[in-house]
Amino acid sequence: MLEKTFDPQSVEPRLYAAWEASGAFKPAEDPNAEPFVIVIPPPNVTGSLHIGHALNNTLQDVLTRFHRMRGKAALWLPGTDHAGIATQMVVERQLAAAGNIGRRDMGREAFVDKVWEWKAESGGAITNQLRRLGASCDWSRERFTLDEGLSAAVRKVFVQLYKQNLLYRDKRLVNWDPQFQTAISDLEVEQKEVDGAYWHFAYPLADGVTYQHPIAFDEDGKATEFETRDYIVVATTRPETMLGDTGVAVHPDDERYKGLVGKFVTLPIVGRRIPIVADDYADPTKGSGAVKITPAHDFNDFGVGKRAGLEAINILTVEAKLNDSVPAEYVGMDRFVARKAIVARAEEEGWLKEIEKTKHMVPHGDRSGVVIEPFLTDQWYVDAKTLAQPALKAVETGETIFEPKHWEKTYFEWLRNIEPWCVSRQLWWGHRIPAWFGPEGSIFVEESEEAAYAAARAQFGADVQLTQDEDVLDTWFSSALWPFSTLGWPEKTSDLERFYPTSTLVTGFDIIFFWVARMMMMGIHFMGEAPFKQVFINALVRDEKGAKMSKSKGNVMDPLILIDELGCDAVRFTLTAMSGQARDIKLSKQRIEGYRNFGTKLWNASRFAQMNECVRVEGFDPSTVQQPINKWIRGETVKTVAEVTKALEAPSFDEAAGALYRFVWNVFCDWYLELAKPILNGDDAAAKAETRATAAWALDVILKLLHPVMPFITEELWEKTAEFGPARETMLISAKWPELPADWIDAEAEAEIGWLVETVGEIRSIRAEMNVPPSAKPGLTIVGAGPETKARLARHRDLLLTLARLDAVREADAAPAGSAPVVMGEATGALGVAEFIDVAAEKARLTKDIAGHAGEIEKVNKKLGNPDFLARAKEEVVEENRERLAEAEAAKAKLEAALSRLASVG
């Protein structure tokens, strides 16, 4: 007999161990089985499972389990990312906390050994947490982006791209983190709003040049008064960068400065003559319309400098201190100390014209927390523009599709405006760049040191000294190879032949560019076809109010704590049910508790079936059932199988979960089992046997359909129900997905039981909306019933009385006074409610509630009709108001219908 309640804490680890030990996570060995392949977005080896991981990996597991049950060779390939900067930071902090010497004092080799030690001891935490989530990955194929096989693939790709002129070394601006002293990607840059200022500086014109500057204007904006100036005003939020200025830009159509283009200013403090250039980047409507240009320390200025042929002067060290390119008094000064010194000098010497306080966005390192500097340095770059063209074409032609489709637009925008990809990082933990520097500026890019020395020997005719590049590759470089390097490339492995390209990628929108696009580029370039047929972009998980989760807000939900408290199945079902396309997930603990109750409902239904001897019967054929309710549940089961299958094939996760929830809770538990009780408690042995077998069969189908989403409770019920009836051939994880013929839907049974369900449901709704006490038993009068309705009434009178809590069901020529109308096909029902309620009080209550909703609708409509609100409010706040409006309108409509119905009562 089943226990009274399901205990996830004891069941989950036992079942997971059994699945893994049985080899169920490995793809079917049948060479004819169609592959279904997902590569996991590799979590950082430093990471722990957060709610975003829980969502992403739940959806991957749902698909993997579904396709495995459909007989495909399902492979979900797991692994972790070495996470260069994150891991190096963790180990450096641990060393510091333990009082050890720093990384640089320790030396590269010793430090990297320490990182490997840390990885061996602590690096497996997140994979164990994925097991807690029920992830059915093939752990025998687990990969790590720094394991030897993947490292060999990385070296080969780097060398081949270099020799194909698609990878090169260049001096360009990068995001520079002065604390970690490395270039970082845009994804590792966090924009923070800070209090700052625009300092307006007057740069004196050189060579005695002056010009007429407008100072008064008429109502049409035409200048009416001028003053002679021998300077031009520029504004900056970073005064220290002026020491690296090599130009001033004005818009070519700006009449104020047309005569100054080609002239020079003398840069204060430095004394350098720098030209005034015309460039569209300068905005005549902002500030003075003139912009100081520092090509080595601003991304926009770098472009202006390239177009105008301006020199790029780097004034910072790797620690963001001023270097020897600046006047001696500033050399070695911290950038922010220099800022104060320069402003003080400008004020003292009279060329500070104005200080304009402002709030502005400043880039910070997401891990270091320090202000990031645009920094001019030699780095390695991939020619992403060339590689992007086939990746664009693959999505344009439908070789790879995005779900939801609107994310294709984001993909196209990024790839059509792509810049060279900086792939080098000034770190020690990662794939060391396979490039060796030799005499006379020579560079040898090879897969091994031996090959580099051989190439140098061939070039110079003798052995020469080579030094390997100290830098490592951007973590995203190795991640870009993930779909094929994990399958054994560059070796021609059987896995690579069988499982590439993969089927579906499930990932977040924030890494479409950083990861998805780069996998597309690399996969097509090295494998000749796109790495996946479909990219499913999952939503962002927010809190119940729609706000982004963050530690500072205190609204973070830890999935491991939720799993401990409420069980893994409840967490998984919630995330699946809320994964509607094109909308974020508003998650609350109450919602998860609700889906835990769904699991309890299934467990209790199974206990009910067991207590009523609803046991699987060898050779039972559902097509032969005779009882209308059994024909009906058979048809409902057929429809649900089709609906869930279609939804998971798409995939449309919320539709699959919705169909499962409705069928299990409403159709099977609330209706079928209730309708079956009279038969199960009756004396008709044949009907009883058929109903028991049908209930057991339908429950088996439910377990199969629910398994991809709620694997633990379904596997436990599968195992426990195997104690009765024929033996199970396999564990549920390996069971065959149900395929049921459409002709099992019986139109006559569907119509008859559908009529009964709708009638009882309608009566229950009336009772609820009119506040009829649960203990009250009103009578139901039927008016205008035809022969079919009369026959149905005769067959189901007892069920109507019980399920609708009625005193009597009778026929009459007219509806009695004080009754509420009930739709019953061609007939009309009249529910006698007047004696059980205070009609006037109910009318007053409904009228008051309607007015309340009307007020809410007016209030929200006013807000949503205000352009200022729409422009200023956060997206989640606007969406929350739209949802409030929809809910209020639906509630008002329902109450108005109830009030209309009440009017007929009295």
UniProtKB/Swiss-Prot annotation:
GO MF terms, alphabetically ordered: aminoacyl-tRNA deacylase activity; ATP binding; valine-tRNA ligase activity
GO cellular-component term (any): cytosol
Function per UniProt: Catalyzes the attachment of valine to tRNA(Val). As ValRS can inadvertently accommodate and process structurally similar amino acids such as threonine, to avoid such errors, it has a 'posttransfer' editing activity that hydrolyzes mischarged Thr-tRNA(Val) in a tRNA-dependent manner.
UniProt keyword terms in alphabetical order: Aminoacyl-tRNA synthetase, ATP-binding, Coiled coil, Cytoplasm, Ligase, Nucleotide-binding, Protein biosynthesis
Subcellular location: Cytoplasm
Keyword Protein biosynthesis in annotation: yes
NCBIfam families linked: PRK05729.1, valS
GO biological process: valyl-tRNA aminoacylation
Motif placement: 'HIGH' region: 43-53
Alphabetized SUPFAM superfamilies for the sequence: Anticodon-binding domain of a subclass of class I aminoacyl-tRNA synthetases, Nucleotidylyl transferase, tRNA-binding arm, ValRS/IleRS/LeuRS editing domain
Protein name: Valine--tRNA ligase
Protein family membership: Belongs to the class-I aminoacyl-tRNA synthetase family. ValS type 1 subfamily.
EC number: 6.1.1.9
Quaternary structure (record): Monomer.
Lineage, broadest ranks: Bacteria, Pseudomonadati, Pseudomonadota, Alphaproteobacteria, Caulobacterales
InterPro entries: aa-tRNA-synth_I_CS (IPR001412), aa-tRNA-synth_Ia (IPR002300), Anticodon_Ia_Val (IPR033705), M/V/L/I-tRNA-synth_anticd-bd (IPR013155), Rossmann-like_a/b/a_fold (IPR014729), tRNA-bd_arm (IPR010978), tRNAsynth_Ia_anticodon-bd (IPR009080), Val-tRNA_synth_C_sf (IPR037118)
Coiled coil regions in record: 842-905
Keyword Protein biosynthesis recorded: yes
Binding site for ATP: K551
